[in-house]
Amino acid sequence: MSEPTGSGQPGGGVWAAREYDERPWGSYTVLDDEAHDHKVKRIVVKPGKRLSYQQHARRSEHWFIVSGRGAVTIDAVAVPVAAGHAVDIPVGAAHRIENTGNADLVFVEVQHGDYFGEDDIVRLEDDFGRAGPG
């Protein structure tokens, strides 16, 4: 896990980011990737953008919406989400999130499983021409 900075008191420090990447839909920052059974990311989706409709064979995901509003689709069922909402995505479920607001949609993603590589992503639909295996 990353080493914290600051005083160690609540609100007194932050975790140092491990990896940052920009994508066509926004960006993500890896917050924790050293455990063998989970990985934690902060994900930002720009207004009007959405992630690919995808599946994972070796991990589940839990999303906690920090700010903004959007729609989450799991196995073809879409539900609205906003700050404070949480979503559980089982292993193998087809899923995506879309920003339906006019501000960034920010959420924390906790992946749980035994493998977190890009090749455990099967993109069923993608707005940016990336459909197919990761």
Model-derived segments and spans:
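Short beta-strand segments
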Residues: L51, V77-V79, D120
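A short, N-terminal "cap"/entry segment at the start of jelly-roll beta-barrel domains
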Residues: M1-K39, K46, S52, I121-G134
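A generic "binding-loop/recognition-motif" signal
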Residues: K49, R58-R59, V77, A93, ...
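Glycine- and acidic-residue-biased ligand/ion/polar-headgroup-sensing regions
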Residues: R58-A71, D75-A76
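Short beta-strand His + acidic residue motifs that chelate non-heme Fe in jelly-roll/DSBH
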Residues: S52-Q54, V72-T73, I89, H95-G101, ...
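Short acidic-glycine-tyrosine-enriched beta hairpin
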Residues: A76-A94
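Short histidine-centered beta-strand/loop micro-motifs
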Residues: L31-D33, K41-I43, L51-H56, F64, ...
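A short hydrophobic beta-strand segment most commonly corresponding to one strand
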Residues: H62, N102-R123
